[in-house]
Amino acid sequence: MKKLFLASSFADVFDLFLDFAGNIQNKSITFIPTASKVEEVKFYVDDARNAFLQQGAFIDELDLSTASLAEITDKLAKNEMIYVSGGNTFFLLQELTRTGTAQLIQQHIQAGKMYIGESAGAMISAPNIDYVKYMDSLDQAPMLRDFTALNLVDFYVVPHYTNFPFVEAAQKIIDTYSTTLPLQPIDNHQAILVNNETKIIRGNHKG
């Protein structure tokens, strides 16, 4: 049972998440803000954290760039959901790969644990993130040699479609890859709900 909630701006679609996930009071969430660690703008991490807390969920923060493998393994195993924040997708993949977390997350998702991905956390669910180079800087991930990502879905999320300040970047991705990759653009008020192999787009496009 594979269950994913993929969004551009999690706080803006939190109601859609609750419709999808149900009551999250007392649910424990492995909260991974790693992608934001190399970004100057990171308000979205606090917004997501606060949204969970206001519904009575427990946040168990996990920064892959500093955590040990034992800590990573323990937190992913004991908590009920996995949330991966926005930020730099290449830095996120570098740390997922370096720590071995990518394989652990794949195993937990295949076993039925819910995955929640916001922006970079949504794009990392694709088979490969080479297409993200028009939105994120590779300079933040000097150790990254392979763009193979989590491969949780068979499509490629393009977040923030028509939303400032990513209008040009999102359109460049679409112009470049629309004929070669199964892209799925979503704006800040839309989300992709995945149940096994079924994909549903929720929310109204407001571009």
Swiss-Prot record:
* E.C. number(s) listed in UniProt: 3.4.21.-
Q: Which GO terms describe its molecular function?
A: serine-type peptidase activity
Instruction: Give any Pfam family that matches.
Output: Peptidase_S51
Reading the lineage from the top rank, the first entry is: Bacteria
**What InterPro entries is this protein classified in?**
Class_I_gatase-like (IPR029062), Peptidase_S51 (IPR005320)
List of catalytic residues: S119 (charge relay system), H160 (charge relay system)
KW Secreted (keyword) present: no
Gene3D superfamilies registered for this protein in UniProt: 3.40.50.880
Q: Which residues cross the membrane?
A: none
Q: Top enzyme class of this protein? A: hydrolase
Q: Which SUPFAM superfamilies match?
A: Class I glutamine amidotransferase-like
One example of a Gene Ontology biological process annotation = proteolysis
Alphabetized UniProt keyword annotations: Hydrolase, Protease, Serine protease
Q: Which family does it belong to?
A: Belongs to the peptidase S51 family.
Protein's recorded name: Uncharacterized peptidase PM1590
Origin species, per record, is Pasteurella multocida (strain Pm70)
